[in-house]
Amino acid sequence: MKFLFIVQGEGRGHLTQAITLEEILRRNGHEVVEVLVGKSSSRRLPGFFNRNIHAPVKRFVSPNFLPTPANKRVSLMRSVAYNLVKLPVYINSINYIRQRIEASGADRVINFYELLTGLTYFLFRPSVPQICIGHQYLFLHKSFEFPKADKVSLALLKFFTVLTSLGAKERLALSFRYMKDDPQNNIRVIPPLLRKEVTLHEPYSGDYIHGYMVNAGFSENVMKWHRQHPGIPLRFFWDKWEEEPVKRVDNTLSFYQLDDVEFLRQMAGCKAYASTAGFESVCEAMYLGKPILMVPAHIEQDCNAYDAKKSGAGIISSDFNLQQLLEFAKDYHPNRDFVYWVRGAEYTLLNLLESDSSNYQQVLFNDCLLYTSPSPRDISGSR
């Protein structure tokens, strides 16, 4: 079978999942004919993606979330205003996606949570079946438990998730643990897609804390904590592309440009891991048996962190309070069930992708009403 990938380019999670799925498909005799990746002025495609993906990569301009002026949590108002101005550009991108779907000769389109893919299918109804993959589709599962959060923000998150999957035959929801499928919402629950490099690493406990932050503004938190605890080695990765590959602050604090090989190597040998609660790196740390401090940067990561904590991954904080992480690490016990769950990903995924999806109904726009109509009591209660 021939597959076309369309990938949200924000962060490293969806990019890593695309690399992993391409490896699985190629290993089993299938072909990825092309990879379309969303781009924006505030994000750069990491070098590890171009080095590891085999199919031709093409870019298109896509919506993205802007951080607050302090470059920490995502600012919803700034993001909405910015993306409204860019609407004409996004319309061009939708037309481009439609053209690439038609020209690719693909048997399936795999959508890694890219909004414009859903809008393309809503507006043009391409004949090639679309299958959506991402942990975010678990937010639409009838049994998913949300953290206590602003009801409007949660409704918007679910609305956005539905928009990404308009016209999809199936939603494949990556999960920290086994859950029953939700056929009513076209949701199949599957294990996380971890790269084989993660499974090949032999973890050990070093003397340093490893970390990753999507928004570089969190580096101030890390440096503040470091000044108070200079004896504890810290090695953090960030997306601050204007900096040198390794910014060595002193003998015990360094910031690294995102490099997947080095990132995983350092994770395998760390004492503990601190992150802005992106799904992919939390899964990698869980697989390697590392205690985790999760510092969510937006509502999606609030949900990730809450769900990961339920699975025994670690603790949640509003900032990089690494002392909390060190205390938690003393009594931490890895979740071995997670490792067994992850090892079933390839078999489960191939079964689903190779099956005939013609019996599934497309997810239409009126599905949005199922997820984004909070009651007046919910809205008033969120203030």
Predicted regions and their residues:
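Single conserved hydrophobic/aromatic residue that forms the stacking wall/gate
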Residues: 371-383
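Active-site-proximal region of nucleotide-activated glycan assembly enzymes
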Residues: 128-189
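C-terminal amphipathic helix plus adjacent low-complexity
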Residues: 329-373
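Donor-nucleotide binding loops and adjacent catalytic segments primarily
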Residues: 193-269
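Conserved nucleotide-sugar phosphate-binding/catalytic loop shared by glycosyltransferases and other
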Residues: 9, 28, 33-85
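A donor-sugar binding/catalytic signature common to diverse glycosyltransferases
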Residues: 109-112, 265-304
